């Protein structure tokens, strides 16, 4: 009887202990649902939604390596060897929809390195050098844009062809702080007005004028454009508040076929000197022209020619060949004739130069 009671008591104690341990056990919570990154196709390829928001983000950019030889076609100086330069450009774009329109941002950081034999390439620095620059940083809401961007005087009419040495005869400075508004109509018509701080020295210009405004009065830029399936025509006028002079450009683009297009641009400056922010060509006027021929799906031929009032003539041609998607090799040759008033500014009247660019865009 005692043994039976002992066994029953032990069993009861074990059951009670097991029940107590079960009551004290920690219950693991259910795992939260994983929120995968969603693709956003509202603003083009490469965007995705930032988790937990309705803002779309894209990370993109390029890696570039340039090898240059011959003369510097901007200054006429003999390089006496190869100049090499590399750049990593990191771009970040965002976009979202608001009750006031599309809200966008764009930033670009450039990490540059150069090993120049002659130290003549001001775009990357002299001798062996490296540096980082914030090239773009702007906010755009609808047609309103504020921040660091390129001047509307340069971009509204379009760049000077798809060549690397496109600004041997400069059509104006590039980077500036600005507030601009662009109106875009549904019939191909657009207009822009911009208040700008003044540009930097990215255009190959070597004068001494301080481009930035020296008071509260900004530089003012305005332009009109009409674009259709045949091409476009655009005009832009800029007032330089530092020297109190103005400059203007008119450009036309024509699409001959789907593969072949041509363009022509003329400019005039009231200052008649390149020592200014906008009219950086020599003399009163300058003219540029060019063409592009998409020979194959991978290869494109580009040509640009320019001439200014002081007698400088520049011609550049290249072939941009896409080896594989995202990787393009571009051999280019350029010629500059320093005639007229430009003769006194250079050691040689003629300059021949070449460059090969390797670029991976992503």
Swiss-Prot record:
Homotrimer. This is Porin Omp2b. GO terms for cellular component: cell outer membrane; pore complex. The keyword Transmembrane applies. Belongs to the alphaproteobacteria porin family. The keyword Ion transport applies. InterPro entries: Porin_alphabac. It comes from the Bacteria. The gene is omp2b. One of its GO terms (molecular function) is porin activity. Residues 1-22 form the signal peptide. The lineage of its organism: Bacteria, Pseudomonadati, Pseudomonadota, Alphaproteobacteria, Hyphomicrobiales.
